[in-house]
Amino acid sequence: IDINLDVEKKSNSKDELTGFDVSMDSFAKAVSEIGRNCKEEVLIIVETTVPPGTCKKLVKPIIEEELARRGLQNNKYKLGHSYERVMPGPNYINSIREYPRVYSGIDSQSADATEAFLKTIINTSICNLTRLNNTNETEIAKVLENSYRAMNISFIVEWSRFAEEADANLYSIVNAIRERETHSNLMYPGIGVGGYCLTKDPLLASWSQKAHFDSKNDLNMSTKSVSINDQMPKFAYRRMIEVFGNFEDKNILFLGISYRGDVGDTRFTPVSSLYDYVKAVTKKISLHDPYINYWEEQDIKVEQDIETVLSRSQDIIIISTGHSFYKKDETINKLMKIQSTNIYDTIGLFNNDQIAKLSQKHNLSVLGRGDI
């Protein structure tokens, strides 16, 4: 069952996070529905990313209440938690079957049953199943795992600005640092965070700390990372103005609207914020994405034919999603055939050879590269 878990964020005019709230209503309703229809000895495994404490403080009491209401024993069911680590894109199935899993249960019997089930779908010959002591631990593990990545991304934002001010190539700098094993996952610059995980998961932990555990402490750094990441599109927009000047009433082309490369998914894509900023100064905007023909959140058509959008006179072409299609030789050659224009690579998609080639004809800028 796929269940929505909503986080409502509130921001000021600077896109700084000012507050948030987590609604568990739809999740609780779905759990109640399960309890009204499941067997007495059911195994329930929660894979959804949930606020720590959810299995014990929400799922468990609801299931037991519904079973008792039906006149069934409420001590025979089993409840486990094993969060998914799916990676959208061409390797989606492999990211489920051939990736390590963490799991737990509300008791040892539930944990054993969860392990037995996971062994039927996970290739344990190459992937470890790591058992934690209880569901609080696995729930924390998931939001900590994603908060770490969100913070890593937000960390690089201010260094992108510094690199541009210092006429430095942050990509080369990061590559050099990555040679050190302890720093091998340092992130590259980019337009921002999108999708249905990193945009909210740190907030689930912050909410849970108060709502489920009555804590007086705060996860300030994790919450701050969400606020910083939400502001990344504005930074990219301001940099575009610095480099290319005022583009009021200019023709702008976005290449890519998905939140992730080689995926047709626009949920919480950072491109949406950048699009809104650009739309405020010009209505002459074209959109292209090889995986999407309609942008639901913006209620607008998206072109899938690259030649159609390139045939129009474009004042600025924004590389906004890391689709491999855009760095193919065929696409580069098409870009070389159009009239001289401005190209803004917000994600560091092009390699040095491609940058050199495109720069022979176009005015090219790359986010995080002050050397060009």
Regions found by a protein language model. Give the residues of each.
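Structural/interface elements that position substrates and couple domains in central-metabolism enzymes
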Residues: I1-I372
